[in-house]
């Protein structure tokens, strides 16, 4: 049970956090990367994931997330440029929600893709 733990700046590379209770844990700045790091099914609701390294592998799928984190992920997705028309359409359809990002004032509002 890692609830309320301050793991900010921690190097969790390779840690198996699958099914971990991380409720209200501070993960800001933590390194969650590494091919052996298993975050599947982790409860990420209420987490501060600003400045973390999140692996884009199957080991970080199926998280339980809250609206704040979902919006943060959408903001990052919508910030990228992709020439594919279907991706641009998806990004544009999600912009209103993505621009609710808690750091939009600092990072800037995302404009529609053309």
Residue locations for each model-derived region?
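Tandem repeat scaffolds
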Residues: 1-75
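N-terminal capping/linker segments that flank leucine-rich repeat
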Residues: 48-114
């Amino acid at each position: 049970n890692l609830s309320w733990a301050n793991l900010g700046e921690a190097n969790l590379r390779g840690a198996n956090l699958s099914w971990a209770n991380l409720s209200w844990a501070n993960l800001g700045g933590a390194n969650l990367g590494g091919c052996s790091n298993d975050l599947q099914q982790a409860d990420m609701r209420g987490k501060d994931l600003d400045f973390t390294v999140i692996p884009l592998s199957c080991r970080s799928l199926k998280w339980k997330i809250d609206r704040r984190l979902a919006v943060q992920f959408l903001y990052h997705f919508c910030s990228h440029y992709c020439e594919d028309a279907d991706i641009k359409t998806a990004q544009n359809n999600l912009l209103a929600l993505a621009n609710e990002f808690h750091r939009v004032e600092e990072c800037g509002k995302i404009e529609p893709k053309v």
